[in-house]
Design a protein with these regions (language model features):
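Flavin (FAD/FMN)-binding glycine-rich loop and adjacent Rossmann-like elements that form
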Residues: 1-216
């Protein structure tokens, strides 16, 4: 309370605690601790219970008279679980690289000037002509999966995926076989940036640069 009053900022009244010690990129993961995949109910339940117990143990170490517990997290924060084996998997070194079949441009949420074009091939597989995906379930490796999984890229790839389906139905073909020129024109007509302007590349950077901040 004193910090909130001194700073004239009510947000200073609140503190948050996490169950585990690992950060967004996997640093701080306890040695010898297995990873939760989040692909079945038992795994998700084990993750949830253990993290809640760790969180309560941390709270018990705090002075009880100095704060009230307002809420405990009720949603497992599993950010990457599984994705398709697409025709192409977006790579960390694809920053500033152009793709002929790009359907949108996204950026690294940690460093907004790291630009990626997302090729249609990351959203589908020719072996499954009626299957397409978006966001974190699209094909990507390493840190590129982190870049692709967050909400703005999920929105853009989701919009592209929906439009691909409409074009596939109209053209009578699989999702990987749509006329890419017509698709890109339709996306651009909807104000979607399909290819980034090279003038947006910061000085000292170039296509094929690896953007990685420590993903395991």
């Amino acid at each position: 309370m004193r910090r909130a009053v001194d700073a004239n900022d009510v947000a200073r009244m609140f503190r948050d605690f996490t169950g585990g010690s690992a950060n967004l990129y996997g640093s701080g993961h306890p040695e010898g601790k297995s990873y939760w995949k989040g692909t079945d109910g038992r795994d998700v339940t084990a993750y949830f219970i253990e993290n809640q117990l760790d969180l309560l143990a941390k709270l018990k170490q705090q002075p009880r008279s100095q704060r009230d517990v307002l809420i405990l997290p009720m949603m497992p924060q599993l950010r990457t679980t599984c994705h398709i084996a697409g025709e192409y998997a977006l790579q960390p070194e694809d920053a500033y690289r152009h793709f002929a079949d790009s359907v949108c441009v996204i950026n690294d949420f940690d460093r907004r000037d790291y630009l990626y074009e997302v090729p249609l091939r990351t959203l589908c597989c020719r072996d499954f002509p009626n299957l397409i995906t978006a966001g974190r379930s699209a094909a990507a490796d390493g840190y590129a999966w982190d870049v692709l999984r967050v909400i703005p890229p999920a929105i853009l790839t989701g919009q592209a995926a929906g439009l691909v389906c409409a074009h596939a139905m109209r053209e009578g073909c699989g999702v990987a076989e749509v006329d890419i020129g017509k698709l890109q024109a339709a996306l651009e007509a909807a104000d979607v940036m399909v290819h980034f302007d090279d003038r947006l590349i910061p000085d000292g950077h170039q296509g094929g640069e690896r953007a990685d901040v420590g993903h395991l």
